[in-house]
Amino acid sequence: MVSIDLTTIPEEPGCYQFKDETGTILYVGKAKNLKKRVSSYFQKKSITPRIDILVSLIRDIDVIVTSSEVEALILENNLIKKYQPKYNIDLKDAKSYAFIQISNDPFPRIGIARDRTVKKTGTLYGPFVSAAERDQILKFVKQTFHLRTCKKMTKRACLRSHLGTCAAPCTGKISEPEYQYLVKSADYLLKGKSQDLIYDLRKEMETFAAAEEYEKALVIRDRIAAIENLSERQYVQRQKKSDEHIINYLVSGDTVYLILFHVERGSLTSKEEFVFPETEDFLDEFILQYYSSTKPPNELILPSLPGSGMEEYLTHIRGSHVTLTIPKQGEKKHLLDLAYKNLEVSFFTGKMRLAELGEALHMDTAPEVIECFDISHLRGTGTVASMVSFRDGKPDKRNYRRYKINSAGPSDDYAAMAEVVKRRYSRLLREKSPMPDLIVVDGGPGQLKSAHAILEELSLPIPIISIAKREEEIYIPGRNTPLSIQKKSPASLLIQEIRDEAHRFAITYQKKLRQKSIKE
């Protein structure tokens, strides 16, 4: 099984995405505690053969932290609808696409509908991929607005009526206009118009209070409190027809760590992460570069204003107005804070792994930039090499490189390693480009010796290690025995993760070349 580092996964609510070697999302899940839930997949005993197969395909895990379980639940629903992962519920199954329906009766009932064709008999809300989400929201609406659920109205009071959770129109306790007002309120909530609903309810509460109908005013007050509580937990999904991008960042040392949330029609659907050197106008530079190849959204939510003219520039690119917003409070500020929280989880748990790796290798400072080499061939033919770069513990794919090996003989991994290391660092020397802080080679002492000899030939005092596949043992130059680093420690797992990525990249390149040669 490929090594997956679980030490960086936070113990917070959120969603996790399992990805295969191509980056395709295999499975999306939610959790109250991400670390516990994700770790459970990698225990020795699994529940089903299907999970065994899923786990064997996992090469990467991405997480998005949320503020609550409800947010995680809604985000999971959005991600499953968008990506339709192979190992999630089959979205063609009508049961997984359940709706909430309010019927067209004079005294409408609320319930579950499993088919869009029933739309003629009422108003549909959804669909909901998660039954838990649907049931939770349905339960809230029933308890808050006391709509009936019975299929046929009788003249006898039901159990819900006795419990005070049904308005009981069947017994004449409520008039049709009064009941329709409750239906309208439920409709507002299910359409995401909770702020409009709260505004109307507050006016109604004030009217009752002014008329000294305090019991009715208290009922409305409790209803407002319940809706506000639900709304505070639903920042991840907001009823909007436009799209938004949320950008937040932090600067550490001379490096900018930036995260971008994609919000499509009110639903958080994905995130992107970036690392780059700090400059005086780094935010402006990022926006200009990113949106030169990506259509700007209707609204860009930021922690600070970019330079003047940026709004007009983005509007010009989009072809319609783009709004730049710097929120100080409210749901947009909450999303900005959520982006920052994910930023810390993504980058600074990685910093902790790097610090531990630096200590384990007795380096003066933690290695910010790590480059790793892997050799791949098919029965000694078509030898290729890959080099992957990790910056601050995260893949830096812009600096990945692929090589066809020219000088090494068939199955001569040592000569192939020497060739690729020499080509890489001779070029960096010619270009006067920065060198990595640490070099990792896939293999044992033999591959390490070949690579280290090239570094000495080039007079490059770069720390270098190797990692052997079977036992996950780490070697350093001049020593035939592996370092005493625990195989499941964050430092060792980070090296394994980097090595696995280099191996994946090399295999992908080799397959591509083989397919090309077959076509020719």
Swiss-Prot record:
Subcellular localization(s) per the UniProt record: Cytoplasm
InterPro entries: GIY-YIG_endonuc, GIY-YIG_endonuc_sf, GIY-YIG_UvrC_Cho, UVR_dom, UVR_dom_sf, UvrABC_protein_C, UvrC, UvrC_RNase_H_dom
Domain UVR per the UniProt entry, residue ranges: 195-230
PANTHER family noted in UniProt: UVRABC SYSTEM PROTEIN C, UVRC/OXIDOREDUCTASE
Family: Belongs to the UvrC family.
Gene Ontology biological-process annotations: nucleotide-excision repair; SOS response
Keyword DNA repair: yes
Cellular component GO terms held in the UniProt record: cytoplasm; excinuclease repair complex
Function noted in UniProt: The UvrABC repair system catalyzes the recognition and processing of DNA lesions. UvrC both incises the 5' and 3' sides of the lesion. The N-terminal half is responsible for the 3' incision and the C-terminal half is responsible for the 5' incision.
Superkingdom field: Archaea
Subunit composition and interactions: Interacts with UvrB in an incision complex.
Gene that specifies this protein: uvrC
Pfam families according to UniProt: GIY-YIG, UVR, UvrC_RNaseH, UvrC_RNaseH_dom
Name of the protein in its database record: UvrABC system protein C
Organism: Methanospirillum hungatei JF-1 (strain ATCC 27890 / DSM 864 / NBRC 100397 / JF-1)
Keywords on record: Cytoplasm, DNA damage, DNA excision, DNA repair, Excision nuclease, SOS response
